[in-house]
């Protein structure tokens, strides 16, 4: 850069600093690149798929899928992981459907969870903004976007037309929230539902999410969760197999996929993930229906292998450490999965 341009740039920088405060505009080479911190999802596979060991801090995240696919279960696991690291969490229950007992079963410290059940959408989003601005909250979950009904719609009559009201509400709220959550390091997770596009013909997915397009743009991470199978034992349903696709990821490569078991009343099965990823990475040997690790027989059949790992947390810890080492994720090594293994096995 020639001297004349350099003087002009220095003059412009001084003017900007004077008008908006020192450090408003900085050269990236003069500033240390900040590592993006994360909150574990409670699933080893999903943490790996997200690339940074979980959902990013200080960002907006959207988790969407059909009914009973595991959206709320996944967010409750994220809350539990955040609390284990000393984080303060809030749950904005716009659907008025939070099951406190189930949340406790998943490891959520319900006594220290802040819960709000707002009357209308504007109130819910104002609460989220106030919590984020406080700088004291690490994670806010909104369940769900579809339930954020504008005040004018609630106060109106049945059958009244309210075209685009919710989309405008979300667009305005997200414009205000994005900068605040980044500055304060608060993660905001929006749970969303799926609707079918009216009159969809030809190419493209017939599905869309509620609340307009704003959330699609402002979210740093978007997770699509689906139930792909029902898990049965002796003809009795004991859980679901879930598949999560990272549809959008601004902090790591997108389009990664993770699968895990969600057991009824228990949530994500970490032992199931250890078996699956252990086999995938050749850490656990599978010969026919038998699973083994080193010289130890884990059991015949996947369910028996999971039971063995529950009863032998030291073996589970070894397999988890080997998975982390092979996947090469530094952020995973600081997650609290070891504690989860001990909890799932019943060890104190």
UniProtKB/Swiss-Prot annotation:
Residues 336-348 have a biased composition (Acidic residues). It comes from the Bacteria. GO terms for biological process: DNA recombination; DNA repair; SOS response. Pfam families: RecA, RecA_C. SMART domains: AAA. GO terms for molecular function: ATP binding; ATP hydrolysis activity; ATP-dependent DNA damage sensor activity; damaged DNA binding; single-stranded DNA binding. The keyword Nucleotide-binding applies. InterPro entries: AAA+_ATPase, DNA_recomb/repair_RecA, DNA_recomb/repair_RecA_CS, P-loop_NTPase, RecA-like_C, RecA-like_N, RecA_ATP-bd, RecA_C_sf. ATP binds at residues 65-72. Its main location: cytoplasm. It is found in: Cytoplasm. Belongs to the RecA family. This is Protein RecA. It comes from Campylobacter hominis (strain ATCC BAA-381 / DSM 21671 / CCUG 45161 / LMG 19568 / NCTC 13146 / CH001A).
